[in-house]
Design a protein with these regions (language model features):
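Alpha-helical transmembrane segments and immediately membrane-proximal extracytoplasmic
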Residues: 1-214
Length: 214
């Protein structure tokens, strides 16, 4: 929620609009002049370039989430949070970087730091770090189920009951807290609902059975 509010605040400041205008980010950018789009991108490049050079030169090393979950290397909380915050700042200005990586990194980095101070088995540490990353994804996109699936399929590589329960609880709680923090429950991407006839359902059932048996 903090990162979402930070990103929106930067967008509003840079492109001179507010939540009261009820504009999407794309619409807000489209209404400013070309020079007012160019200058923020130049500033974004400078901030991003200098920031990432400083992080990689003076930081403790950026460790990706999968490596942290595997237990091969620990994420440094300060370096990770700075790296994630820099991503959000550049995204707010107009960088094409995705905004979902930063909350996942920050959540996993902070959790890595916390679990080191408790007597927790390696297996439990991996589960907590993965669930923290999934919770970050759930919060930023308001999608607890998709985030739980991401946690299980991409990070934990397992579908056992224990992992499923932990992922669903963490992602669900993250989404609930984010909604209460004022981010709202707006669906990020809306899709037209297709009209499906009964033959599509029959085909899907048959195809699912064939794939499962194969």
């Amino acid at each position: 929620a903090s990162y979402t509010h930070l990103m929106h605040g930067i967008q509003h400041f840079v492109y001179n609009y507010s939540s009261a205008d009820h504009l999407s980010f794309g619409a807000a950018v489209a209404r400013v002049s070309p020079i007012e789009r160019l200058i923020p991108l130049i500033v974004c490049g400078v901030i991003g370039g200098v920031g990432w050079v400083l992080i990689h030169r003076y930081g403790k090393g950026v460790v990706d989430i999968k490596t942290a979950v595997s237990g091969k290397m620990d994420m440094n909380p300060i370096t990770t949070v700075l790296h994630a915050t820099l991503q959000i700042i550049t995204v707010g200005i107009g960088s094409p970087l995705g905004r979902e990586v930063a909350p996942r990194e920050a959540s996993a980095g902070i959790t890595t730091f916390l679990v080191k101070h408790f007597d927790i088995k390696q297996e439990d540490r991996q589960l907590l770090i993965a669930c923290a990353a999934g919770a970050g994804l759930a919060a930023v996109y308001n999608s607890p189920l998709s985030a739980a699936i991401f946690t299980l399929e991409t990070l934990l590589l397992t579908w056992n009951i224990r992992a499923m329960s932990a992922a669903l609880i963490c992602c669900g709680l993250a989404t609930f807290v984010t909604r209460q923090a004022g981010v709202g429950d707006v669906i990020q991407y809306t899709m037209a609902q297709p009209s499906l006839g009964s033959h599509y359902v029959e085909f899907s059932i048959a195809l699912g059975a064939i794939v499962a048996l194969g």
